[in-house]
A protein has these predicted regions:
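N-terminal acidic leader/helix
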Residues: 1-22
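Residue-level recognition of alpha-helical structural elements
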Residues: 2, 22-26, 52, 56
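Residue-level detector of well-ordered alpha-helical segments, enriched
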Residues: 5, 9, 25-29, 41, ...
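N-terminal glycine-rich anion-binding loops that anchor highly charged ligand groups
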Residues: 36-39
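Short, charged early-sequence alpha-helical segments and their helix-coil boundaries
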Residues: 41-66
């Protein structure tokens, strides 16, 4: 799957949880990615973040960073 598609999908998840406030949204986004994304998709978005994370919203960047921690 292309990085652009993954960014779009991850940001959509981020928008869904945005109303919770960033402190609550970040772990919810990360949990969603772990539960519902294929491991290859998670790896690709982690690599995308390592390459600069272009296009990822701030809360999504933090959530993805927590996956690789």
């Amino acid at each position: 799957m292309s990085p652009d598609k993954l960014v779009y999908m991850a940001n959509q998840i981020g928008k869904f949880f945005a109303g919770q406030g960033e402190d609550k949204a970040v772990p919810l986004i990360a949990d969603h990615l772990v539960k519902f994304w294929d491991p290859r998709m998670r790896k690709a978005i982690i690599v995308h973040l390592a390459d600069g994370g272009g296009g990822l919203d701030a809360a999504v960047q933090k959530a993805v960073a927590s996956l690789s921690a």
